[in-house]
């Protein structure tokens, strides 16, 4: 069973991912952004932890579709150093989500 601490870590990671997708997705990832926001709203809801996990597991796979999902998302910036930093931060947040969700998927 997922702990409340893990829910909060997921929430923080999804918030960071949502900010990056919103800022650097240039409108092409609106569907993914809606799923991320749904994840956050689910975590914040009054539903039972079991119901939350059911939703989080179901929608997790939609985030990493073969085309147009978070696995395809790359942040571009003309400044190579900044681009590398942003993509590293993005990848760290994706790994953070995976490290929590992998035991439940």
Residue spans of the language-model regions?
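Alpha-helix capping and helix-coil boundary motifs
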Residues: 1-2, 9, 28, 45-52, ...
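Amphipathic alpha-helical interaction modules
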Residues: 22-71
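Amphipathic alpha-helical binding modules
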Residues: 62-105
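Short terminal alpha-helical segments
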Residues: 1-37, 91-105
């Amino acid at each position: 069973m997922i702990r409340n601490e893990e829910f909060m870590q997921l929430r923080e990671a999804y918030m960071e991912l949502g900010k990056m997708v919103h800022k650097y997705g240039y409108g092409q990832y609106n569907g993914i952004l809606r799923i991320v926001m749904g994840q956050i709203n689910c975590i914040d809801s009054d539903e039972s932890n079991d119901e939350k996990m059911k939703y989080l597991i179901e929608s997790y796979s939609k985030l990493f579709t073969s085309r147009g999902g978070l696995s395809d998302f790359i942040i571009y910036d003309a400044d190579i150093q900044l681009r590398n930093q942003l993509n590293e931060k993005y990848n760290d947040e994706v790994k953070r989500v995976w490290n929590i969700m992998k035991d439940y998927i």
